[in-house]
Amino acid sequence: MLVVAFASLLGAARAIMMPIDDPTTSDKFQITYANESLWDTLVMKNKTALESGELFDLGPDTKCFLPNMTRLHEQNVQSVNDPEYKQKLIDTLDMGAHIIDASLKNQCLVSQNGFWTYRYCGSGDFTQYHGVAPDPNDKLTYTLGRSSKQIENREFQLLYDDYGYYISEIIESGDICDVTGTPRAIEIQYTCGNVMRPGTLQWTRETKICHYEAQVIVPDLCQLELLSKNQDKKNAVPIICHMSNDVPDKHNIVDIVSNYDVSFVANQVYFLLPMNNSNVDRALLMYTGNATEDGLEMDPFPMEIYKKFIDVMNKMLGLGLLSPPDGKPFDVHDSYQWIGDIVDMHGNYLNRLRLDVDVNMEATLIIDKSINFTGPNNFQWYFRGSDRTKNSKSRFGSLTNDNMMLAGGSIINVDDISKENAQELLEKLVAAGKLSGVIEDNKITQGSPIEASKTKVTKASESTPVSEKNKKAKTVTKTIIRSRDKEEYFKENEKQGEENNAQVPFSAHNNEQHGTISKSERKEENTNQKQLANTQKGDTDTPPQSSQSSANDKLSRSGMGQKEPGVDEIGSELRGNSKKALGSNIDNSSGRSTLNDNSDRIAVENEAREIINSNAYDQSEASVDPNYRNDQQRLNSAKEHTFSQSKEKKSINSEEILETKILNSETLGNNDGVASDVKDEEVVESDRNGVIDDEL
């Protein structure tokens, strides 16, 4: 079983679709079965009927007679010239305008169509926006037209098309169009239809630049005879059919059409809504394609099948074909589960479809024959968003690490789908450039510190593209090695460092992004740092702030005031190596150290300063140029120096560790002080356990 989730089904993330003709305004047909005697009398031996209609086959054993629709339209056009009929048109327009005003006054109709959402408030504005609600200050909110509040100032017209009469109103004074420089305008077509009061906004489309059309169905307009064409009992065209035997086959398409209101949706799929007088209570989805060749009966199903039915469900919701069980319009935060059977043209069962929509308008589509279906109608359950309380529980069930995936920044329920199938599904749904990041993120334990760091770096990298040469310096990794492998590990790193230095010279960095600093400036800064260190040996309680200010001045002049993604992680590595150079012995029960003796503090600080100013690690260059911090050769030299120091000095007081943090805060330009450094960076080394846990 495959599960397809498509985000924001009722909102902005849904694929853009063009509106199709409203199924409630299309032609209706009423099919009547006739035995052979009645068939001969009404059709086969009726010359007038044969001249005004046509015969056609509806299956191998069924013949039907359809009246000529063109002649019916011609008769309607000819009747317009009648004076009495003209007066009837005038009266219909006048009464229709008052019905529209009364029905939609203080009411707002909303419909979603792809990226955009449309809202029309009677005697008010017609708005196009993106999001949950229109915001006048948002750049993605446009007013397509402004209607007058007084009915006397509104202009209505009674027009006619292939589907019959409708009332048209053009409202103007919309927002200025960026292309034409003129106000936007929209034509609203009011029609009769069997929908819930006060009405529905069926569709909205842009016919030309900044000119729009919309269709609004007002059920009370069906009170007017000329506008009631869409009522089945008044406009259904009678079709007479005769079968070779007198007992209709329940699996024949004629039987399906006679019990359901059929509406074409998309992709060879029809929506079958039970008629009021039928003995069925569940809607169906009829697939008219070849189910075997198209893979509808396969398990698992081809992705093309899911794409077809995702489009189908989008259009069904956009056209309002699905109605809540209480008969009220959908609310923005309603959640429900809708289940419908998929049948072929003969009514044979093919498969079962389930649509889950949660309160965040996220939808999940499942096609599976094993879906349990026990409800009296198509809704297995339904929760009103307005009735939901903070303590109410969702019927979706709990999300665990085994049945959730990260896709587009949202966690979705994939109904216990296996991770292998989920990954295969994502490969088809997620863009190739994002798939690797999605899969990689899920390899890390949920909620771990390293995951948070990696997510932070990844997001920064997305906003600022990172070249292939700089990726190593911008990635957070986690390495755990045994003590017996230390020498082999660092030798391998040294070899890798030489390869990296050969492939990625410092000159290859993007100077426009990182800024530059000349060798003379580095030399001058180096001298200033050493002089400042010598002058402060007598007073080690005060951190050398002036060296940092000098470095910041040069960074500001060279355009390096902002840190690039990953610099904090590289700085963490350098600070860790400085601690190793002094050795460490941290209380494993707490992972923290305290400072008790001021004399030890001074001694440790002086010793650390001498090590950092030695040839093993030139801190002045590392503090000036962030790229220089990634020099693998200097990093390996510091690591080699670590082992030589650790052999001479097996342990050190926890006070000395804290002093190392203070020193690193000064040399690496960390102005946050000791407290923040202790809180953010903790490196634990235990020679007794032989494990190093290091974040690079």
Swiss-Prot record:
It holds the Pfam family Yos9_DD. Residues 482-498, 685-696 have a biased composition (Basic and acidic residues). A mannooligosaccharide derivative binds at W116, Q128, D178, R184, E206, Y212. Keywords: Disulfide bond, Endoplasmic reticulum, Glycoprotein, Lectin, Membrane, Signal. The keyword Endoplasmic reticulum applies. GO terms for cellular component: endoplasmic reticulum lumen; endoplasmic reticulum membrane. Lectin involved in the quality control of the secretory pathway. As a member of the endoplasmic reticulum-associated degradation lumenal (ERAD-L) surveillance system, targets misfolded endoplasmic reticulum lumenal glycoproteins for degradation. Residues 450-600, 667-696 are annotated as: Disordered. InterPro entries: Man6P_isomerase_rcpt-bd_dom_sf, MRH_dom, OS-9-like, OS9-like_dom, Yos9_DD. Residues 458-467, 499-518, 528-553, 585-597 have a biased composition (Polar residues). One of its GO terms (molecular function) is carbohydrate binding. Residues 106-224 form the MRH domain. It is found in: Endoplasmic reticulum membrane. Belongs to the OS-9 family. Its main location: endoplasmic reticulum. The keyword Protein biosynthesis does not apply. The gene is YOS9. It comes from the Eukaryota. This is Protein OS-9 homolog. Disulfide bonds join C108-C121, C177-C210, C192-C222. Residues 1-15 form the signal peptide. One of its GO terms (biological process) is retrograde protein transport, ER to cytosol. Glycans are attached at N35, N46, N68, N276, N290, N372, N588. Interacts with missfolded ER lumenal proteins. It is a peripheral membrane protein.
